[in-house]
A protein has these predicted regions:
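Short glycine-enriched loops at secondary-structure junctions
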Residues: 67-72, 115-117, 253
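Active-site mouth loops of central-metabolism enzymes
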Residues: 13-27, 79-92, 157-165
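Extended recognition/assembly regions associated with phosphoester-bond processing machinery
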Residues: 19-27, 43, 50, 55, ...
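N-terminal small/glycine-rich loop or linker at the start of catalytic domains
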Residues: 5-15, 66-79, 144-151
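Glycine/small-residue-rich interface belts in oligomeric ring/scaffold proteins
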Residues: 45-71, 79-80
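Histidine-acidic metal/acid-base catalytic patches
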Residues: 2-14, 26-38, 50, 55, ...
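Active-site acidic/histidine proton-transfer and metal-coordination neighborhood
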Residues: 87-215
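Short, glycine/acidic-enriched loop or turn micro-motifs at the edges of active sites
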Residues: 71, 191-192, 222, 296
Length: 315
C-alpha cells in the first residue's frame, strides 16, 4: 500500500475531527469542544453561511483541518462537468472563494463534489436539486427507483462519459491552482445516484492517477451504498481506494443501506449492520484525516474514531 505522507495538508500528522455540517449553532460547537477538549478539530461545512462562519471563527480558528466546498455556502454546488461556460465560471469563482476561506482558517485540504451529469447549475439545496435530478434525461439510467440509484454500467454510458471527462480535465487544473497555494484538493466519491459523478473504486483510482496534485476524500458511507448498488465487496472497495496512496481525508458516517435499500442517512457509526470495526481498522492505517460526518452523537462518534486511530478497542 502506498503511504500518504502529509495527510493533514503538510502541517503534521493526520488528525481526527468532525464536520460542522452536524452543528447548527455556536452552542453546539462550544458543547463539542467542552466534551472533546483541546484536541477538537473541524471541517468547515458547505452549509455554513458567511454570517455563521464569521460568528464561529473565534471558536474554531486554529482548529480547522479541512473545508468542504463551497464555503461559505453558495446557491449552487460546483459543476466542473458542465458544457455551459457560465456555470463553469461561477463554479471556479466559488472554488476560489473557498480556497481563500481555507487559507484564512489554516485548512490544508478542501473536499469537493466534482460535478454532475448535466450542463445546469446544481442547487446546493436538496429540495431545489431533486427536480433537476428527476428530469426525463436521467430516467433511462435509473436501476432502482427509490433514490434514483444507478448501476455499475452508468459510468460507461454515452450520457455519462463526456461529463466525466470534462470534470477530470478541470479538476487537474484546479488541483494545481490549489497546490500552488499550499492546499490539497480532494475529490469525494458520491452516492450512486443518477446524475452524480464518480462513485466506484475504479473511478476513484482513475482520479488518483490523473495528477500528483489531485487527491481523494473517501466517504465510507457513500461507498457502503455503492457496494450494494453495484455488487462489489465493500471492505475490498475501501482497501482499493486507500491503496491508491492519494486519500487525504475520510468522511466517516454509517447508514441503514442493505441489498435493495439505499439510504444516505449520515447516522452514527454504531448503526446496526455497519461493519464499524473493520472499516476503522482500514482507514486508521491510511494516515488520512478521519472526519466524522454523522449528524448525531458527534462527540461519541469522535471518541470512537480517536480510539481506532490510537489502536485501542472501540467497543
Amino acid at each position: 500500500m502506498a503511504r500518504n505522507g502529509w495527510a493533514s495538508g503538510g502541517r503534521g500528522e493526520a488528525v481526527t475531527g468532525v464536520s460542522l455540517v452536524g452543528m447548527k449553532s455556536l452552542e453546539a460547537i462550544e458543547g463539542y469542544i467542552d466534551e472533546i477538549g483541546p484536541n477538537a478539530r473541524f471541517e468547515l461545512s458547505y452549509q455554513m453561511s458567511a454570517e455563521f462562519l464569521a460568528q464561529a471563527a473565534p471558536l474554531i480558528r486554529g482548529r480547522v483541518v479541512s473545508a468542504h466546498a463551497c464555503c461559505p455556502s453558495t446557491e449552487f454546488f460546483p459543476n466542473l462537468a458542465s458544457a455551459d461556460p457560465s456555470v463553469v465560471a461561477q463554479s471556479l469563482t466559488d472554488m476560489e472563494t473557498t480556497l481563500e476561506t481555507a487559507l484564512g482558517f489554516g485548512a490544508g485540504i478542501v473536499v469537493l463534489h466534482a460535478g454532475y451529469v448535466t450542463d445546469l447549475a446544481m442547487p446546493s439545496s436538496y429540495a431545489a436539486r431533486k427536480p433537476i435530478l428527476s428530469r426525463p434525461e436521467f430516467l433511462n439510467d435509473v436501476r432502482h427507483a427509490d433514490g434514483a440509484i444507478c448501476g455499475p454500467e452508468y459510468r460507461a454510458s454515452p450520457g455519462y462519459i463526456p461529463y466525466a471527462e470534462r470534470a477530470k480535465e478541470r479538476l487537474v487544473a484546479l488541483a494545481r491552482r490549489y497546490a500552488r497555494a499550499g492546499v490539497r484538493l480532494a475529490v469525494e466519491n458520491l452516492n450512486p445516484r443518477v446524475g452524480y459523478l464518480f462513485h466506484s473504486p475504479e473511478e476513484m483510482l482513475e482520479l488518483a492517477a490523473l495528477d500528483p496534485d489531485l487527491w481523494l476524500c473517501l466517504d465510507v458511507g457513500h461507498l457502503y451504498i455503492t457496494s450494494f448498488a453495484f455488487g462489489f465487496d465493500y471492505l475490498e472497495g475501501l482497501k482499493t481506494i486507500i491503496g491508491s496512496g492519494k486519500v487525504a481525508s475520510c468522511h466517516l458516517h454509517a447508514n441503514s443501506s442493505e441489498p435493495g435499500r439505499y439510504r444516505d442517512d449520515h447516522s452514527s457509526l454504531k448503526e446496526q449492520g455497519f461493519p464499524l470495526e473493520e472499516v476503522l481498522k482500514i482507514v486508521a492505517a491510511s494516515r488520512a484525516n478521519l472526519i466524522v460526518e454523522a449528524v448525531e452523537d458527534l462527540a461519541g462518534n469522535t471518541r470512537i474514531v480517536q480510539k481506532a486511530a490510537a489502536g485501542r478497542e472501540i467497543l
